[in-house]
Design a protein with these regions (language model features):
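Conserved acidic segment of CheY-like receiver
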Residues: 5-15, 20-25, 33, 64-65
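Alpha4 helix (beta4-alpha4-beta5 surface) of REC/receiver domains from two-component response regulators
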Residues: 18, 22, 77, 100-115, ...
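Active-site residues of response regulator receiver
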Residues: 67-68, 97
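Short amphipathic alpha-helix used as the core "switch/output" element in two-component signaling
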Residues: 51, 76-89
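Residue-level signal for the "D+5" position in two-component response regulator receiver
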Residues: 35, 72-73, 110
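Active-site beta3 strand of CheY-like receiver
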Residues: 53-65
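The feature encodes the CheY-like receiver
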Residues: 71-72, 101
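Acidic catalytic/metal-coordinating carboxylates
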Residues: 38, 59, 74-77
């Protein structure tokens, strides 16, 4: 696996992790989903520290998805830490939270989150969200088909 093949999910609810893994499989996301239980573990993963020191086994992610309300360190703590690390300037961060609070959405945006989505109540809606993730952040752009243009060139 390479960093282009990995998505890091920071989520403390085991049921939500299982639903997310199932949605990833259903949508056919061609990425490894690595799940950690809180913001502290996510930071350790990104640092390559402790049990995450083997980058062959724990490659850097191409996308970070985080819940906000977690034990130890929150999603806000994680976003704030990522924002201070220049090596992660290009890492897209998505918040998937049960919070409907505008202040949470605003703070997540201020801390660099590219999107803030409320956790859906139904699995089908989660599958739809994963489809959006795949489209926007997990599928490389396809090269333009230049054959029609090349055929018209002298």
């Amino acid at each position: 696996m390479t960093e282009h093949d990995t998505v890091l999910l920071a989520e403390d609810d085991e049921n939500d992790v299982l639903l997310f893994q199932t949605a990833f499989k259903k949508v056919g996301v061609p990425k490894l989903l690595v799940c950690v239980p809180d913001g502290e573990d996510a930071i350790e993963y990104l640092k390559g520290a402790g049990i995450y020191s083997n980058r062959m086994e724990y490659p850097l992610p191409c996308l970070l998805i985080t819940d906000l309300k977690m034990v130890k360190r929150t999603g806000f703590d994680l976003l704030e830490w990522v924002q201070t690390q220049t090596q992660f300037n290009g890492l897209p961060a998505i918040v998937l939270s049960s919070s409907l609070e505008e202040s949470d959405k605003r703070r997540a945006s201020e801390l660099g989150a590219q999107a803030y989505w409320v956790k859906p109540a139904h699995f089908e809606d989660l599958v739809e969200l994963v489809c959006l993730l795949k489209e926007k952040w997990l599928t490389p752009p396809q090269p333009a088909d230049l054959s029609s243009i090349q055929n018209r060139l002298p």
